[in-house]
Amino acid sequence: MFLFSVFLAACDSQSIEEDSTSTSCENNRHCYYPNNAEAWLSNPDISPETPFAINLKLPNGAKNLAAKLEGVTMYMGFIPLQFKRKGQVWVADTMVGACSEPVMTWKMTLTYNTVDNQPRTLFYYFDSIQTR
């Protein structure tokens, strides 16, 4: 029973992202964060192995962006993201791999520094759906 309790505590997703900026938006939807950041997909209907873009609006002066995608439903390693600024929006073109699950949840982790060099981290979740 003790080992079962330890296992359940280790799987608690609430214990992982305490010091980060997250939001309660729905997967695949435009998300607004408390620090005036926004994240959204070029197309809310994501299919594996099909290109799409992730868009960001960040506070003025944001710099040193680093981002990656990781599978939540099934860990499949991580996919680095390269954001490029296009006007007021940061854009990363990417795609996700196919998984044995029909619906796969992905997590984008983004870190950046504010204009006064304060580090910030935000998370954005979305689902890909196997259509074949």
Indicate residue ranges for each PLM-predicted region:
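Sec-dependent signal peptide recognition
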Residues: 1-3
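Short, exposed beta-strand-loop hairpins at the edges of beta-sheets
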Residues: 108-123
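C-terminal motif of bacterial Sec signal peptides marking the signal peptidase cleavage site
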Residues: 7-10
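Contiguous segments within soluble domain cores/interaction surfaces
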Residues: 12-101, 105, 124-130
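A short, hydrophobic secondary-structure junction motif
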Residues: 112, 130-132
